[in-house]
């Protein structure tokens, strides 16, 4: 469990540190710093919703929902007997990211985003779209953790075959 909580703390620390930098250098100043022209920039944005800026509930409900999900993930990891790195890492990334964004909701009433990949901006079917949202370290940790759970699902949660049956192919 030391590994789990170390990763959670690392994600929260990196997330909050980089958000503090974004607040200091991007919010009241230049708003955006181009790193790679037409591809990658640090661009300040405030997100009152969830992923991709979707607003489906008031901020208080989002905070409570995030808190409940985080507690459920923590409880699952603590009560699980699996202590492998492959099991702990994705759940630690998801937990750390969730807590990082919860801190923002409590402190600012919104989540600070600043990482932007300009993959496509333009019209699709007559409607202007920006293909990729502005996001942060916490969002990245949550996404990587969720992808790891999907990719390694069969290793993490092996299906138990009913007794007395064989796998004939």
UniProtKB/Swiss-Prot annotation:
Gene: lspA
One Gene Ontology MF term: aspartic-type endopeptidase activity
Protein name from the UniProt record: Lipoprotein signal peptidase
Similarity annotation: Belongs to the peptidase A8 family.
Entries under PANTHER family matching the protein: LIPOPROTEIN SIGNAL PEPTIDASE
Job of this protein: This protein specifically catalyzes the removal of signal peptides from prolipoproteins.
Transmembrane segment boundaries: 59-79, 84-104, 132-152
Pathway: Protein modification; lipoprotein biosynthesis (signal peptide cleavage)
Coiled-coil ranges from the UniProt annotation: none
């Amino acid at each position: 469990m030391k590994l789990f909580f170390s990763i959670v703390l690392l994600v929260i620390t990196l997330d909050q540190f980089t958000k503090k930098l974004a607040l200091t250098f991007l919010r009241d100043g230049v708003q955006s710093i181009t790193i790679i022209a037409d591809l990658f920039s640090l661009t300040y944005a405030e997100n009152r919703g969830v992923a991709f800026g979707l607003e489906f509930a008031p901020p208080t409900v989002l905070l409570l929902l995030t808190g409940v999900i985080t507690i459920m993930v923590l409880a699952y990891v603590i009560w699980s007997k699996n202590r492998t790195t492959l099991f702990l890492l994705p759940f630690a990334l998801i937990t750390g990211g969730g807590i990082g964004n919860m801190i923002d909701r409590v402190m600012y009433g919104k989540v600070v985003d600043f990482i932007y990949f300009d993959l496509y901006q333009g019209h699709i079917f007559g409607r202007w779209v920006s293909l990729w949202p502005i996001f942060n370290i916490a969002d990245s940790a949550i996404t990587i953790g969720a992808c790891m759970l999907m990719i390694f699902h069969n290793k993490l949660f092996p299906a138990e075959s009913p007794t007395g049956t064989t796998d004939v192919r």
